[in-house]
A protein has these predicted regions:
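A short alpha-helical cap/connector motif
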Residues: 1-116, 123-145, 149-193
Length: 193
């Protein structure tokens, strides 16, 4: 797919998301996530919160270039069908498994270790249990982006406090739109709990 055609699909997805009250990942955060997937050579990516598929399309493109696979999880089957349609139009459906499931339940059944993850769930209370369930499935130096940490700071306070207290995570916060936490999993770091 040409970069122009891909951009047209991404623009259409963003418009669809805003019309339907489900703002997607900020474009700059999506581009950074795509770049991180490519530069780390991620093979197994996980998206918790498919939404309408905007970030899914970015991640799927990186997985296609890396020869990897993406699992994208959402409880909303209607939104996943929108994502499926756009992924098919982009020719990327073959690198994505869409799962209509609870985030924690889906994480607990993963077969492959995770190199890269995006947490962008509508249910902010599910961020921390999802991340905790993900820990034993993360490869060393796995990268995780969690969206909405500034716009939903109060709802995600326990999530962020837990990360800050966990010495096996390196954390930086990004300023794009609603804010993102960018984490790197360092399991051999001293002071683990």
């Amino acid at each position: 797919m040409s970069s122009v055609a891909r951009q047209e699909l991404l623009d259409a997805l963003r418009q669809h998301a805003h019309r339907n009250g489900a703002p997607p990942l900020h474009p700059d955060a999506a581009r950074l996530l795509h770049w991180l997937a490519l530069t780390t050579g991620a093979q197994h990516a996980l998206e918790l919160g498919t939404g309408n598929g905007y970030a899914t399309l970015w991640l799927a493109d990186a997985m296609a270039q890396n020869g990897g696979q993406l699992i994208s999880v959402d409880r909303d089957a209607v939104r996943q069908e929108v994502a499926r349609d756009y992924l098919a139009r982009a020719g990327l459906l073959d690198v994505v498994t869409l799962r209509c499931d609870d985030a924690v339940a889906a994480v607990e059944t993963l077969d492959s270790p995770v190199d890269l993850a995006l947490i962008d769930l509508g249910d902010k209370e599910a961020y921390l249990p999802s991340l905790r369930a993900l820990l034993p499935r993360l490869r060393p130096h796995a990268v995780i982006m969690a969206d909405n940490v500034r716009s939903h700071a109060q709802e995600l306070a326990a999530f962020l406090d837990w990360i800050r207290a966990e010495p096996r995570f390196a954390l930086t916060e990004l300023p794009f739109g609603p804010g993102q936490a960018l984490l790197c999993w360092l399991p051999d770091r001293a002071g683990t709990r």
